[in-house]
Amino acid sequence: MSRIHYELANVESPFAWRSKFALAHKGLAYESRRTAFTDIPTICEGRHKTVPVLVDEDGTETCESMAIASYLDEKYESATPLLGGGRQARTEEIEGLLGPHGFQAFFPLYILDIHNGLPEKDAAYFRESREKRFGATLEELSNNRDERLPAAREGLQPLRDALGDKQWYDGDNPGYTDCVVLAFFAFIKGCAKTPPLAAGDPLLGYIERGFALYDDLGNSIQGGPLA
């Protein structure tokens, strides 16, 4: 059987993109199967409640991006490692920055854009589940985006500082930490109707290098400009 990667349809998932970058890092081909939010319970006969899900050529099923990265390192150890050599600690460190300074700052600003790009059935599910999670309407969450964007951009400074003058977050060569960061910007690029970054942001050079990896994988995303 072919290797299958289940990911969301109609919206770019940051967690699916982590796995897509990880698979490309390992040089592994796969079939992408895009699945609607409301169809996730049908994946693998209901054995998984979220995506991404990787079904390997031998039928092994792995769910969630970090578990997939660990599985790939264990199964394909001869290929370039994702998490070895202390990289897992580095990934956890950067994830600790990306949560409050990335997802929590930017996701609410673009949450209505995501909703508006979904088909009716998924849009209803997305609205109900996200409004319950955040305790506010999507309109309230994304209100005054233009006025709030400068603070969100400024809040990325810890990520800029962590990169410094290095080419990659994992050092001389990209690793899973870079998959995580690039996946966040892949997600934002795919959903943002207003550029999330300002022109001249030092992160733009890093993103350009990262999106060019693996035969321009990141540049395959359909979306607006990042700045």
Regions found by a protein language model. Give the residues of each.
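GST-like fold's C-terminal all-alpha helical module
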Residues: 99-208
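Charge-dense, extended regions
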Residues: 220-227
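GST-like domain detector, emphasizing the conserved glutathione-binding G-site
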Residues: 1-125
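Metal-dependent nuclease catalytic core centered on acidic motifs
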Residues: 213
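NAD(P)-dependent Rossmann-like dehydrogenase/reductase catalytic/cofactor-binding core
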Residues: 216-217
